[in-house]
């Protein structure tokens, strides 16, 4: 359910763009959906996690700039900025002697610190790659960016999760 909730504004953005072929209208729908979603989550849980706050700020800033200036490049930059901020957070926490990934999901899975470090490197590299890939698509193939955002980046994430799962399964077997 959380996965669908997290993708709600992306799905509405894609649906609106598919019907209207208007990036500004699609951005307006995503902006409203993002704000309503954040308000609902805050009302229900009395808090938003860090990534929800970051996502909200980015959709308001980049979505707002897209709407006010009538320039779709701003909303196209948003995923790259989000990916790069994620990579910066993970790398920065690693350099500070902490593991942001372990802090986020360490309650669900127990791993040695060396494995957490490798996972962090994998995530940092992947997030940098995803930011570059998004930038490449929107600067070279602007008309295809919406399809890439919906399907291409989702497929890349799925492949990354599978690779990560395979890596983790080998690490967990070594521990047994």
UniProtKB/Swiss-Prot annotation:
Keywords: Cell inner membrane, Cell membrane, Membrane, Transmembrane, Transmembrane helix. Pfam families: IspA (PF04279). It is found in: Cell inner membrane. GO terms for cellular component: plasma membrane. The chain crosses the membrane at residues 23-43, 50-70, 74-94, 119-139, 150-170. It is a multi-pass membrane protein. It comes from the Bacteria. HAMAP family: YciB. Plays a role in cell envelope biogenesis, maintenance of cell envelope integrity and membrane homeostasis. PANTHER family: INNER MEMBRANE-SPANNING PROTEIN YCIB (PTHR36917:SF1), INTRACELLULAR SEPTATION PROTEIN A-RELATED (PTHR36917). Belongs to the YciB family. This is Inner membrane-spanning protein YciB. It comes from Neisseria meningitidis serogroup B (strain ATCC BAA-335 / MC58). The gene is yciB.
């Amino acid at each position: 359910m959380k996965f669908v909730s997290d993708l709600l504004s992306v799905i509405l953005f894609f649906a609106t763009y598919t019907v209207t072929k208007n990036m500004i209208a699609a951005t307006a729908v995503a902006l409203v959906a993002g704000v309503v979603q954040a308000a609902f989550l805050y009302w229900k849980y009395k808090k938003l996690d860090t990534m929800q706050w970051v996502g909200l700020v980015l959709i308001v800033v980049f979505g707002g700039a897209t709407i006010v200036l009538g320039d779709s490049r701003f909303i196209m930059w948003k995923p790259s900025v989000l990916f790069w901020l994620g990579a910066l957070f993970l790398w920065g926490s690693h350099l500070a002697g902490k593991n942001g990934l372990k802090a986020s999901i360490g309650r669900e899975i127990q791993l040695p610190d060396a494995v957490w470090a490798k996972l962090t490197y994998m995530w940092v590299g992947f997030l940098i790659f995803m930011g570059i890939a998004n930038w490449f698509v929107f600067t070279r193939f602007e008309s295809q960016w919406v399809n890439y955002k919906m399907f291409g980046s989702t497929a890349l994430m799925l492949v990354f999760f599978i690779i990560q799962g395979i890596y983790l399964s080998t690490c967990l077997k070594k521990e047994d």
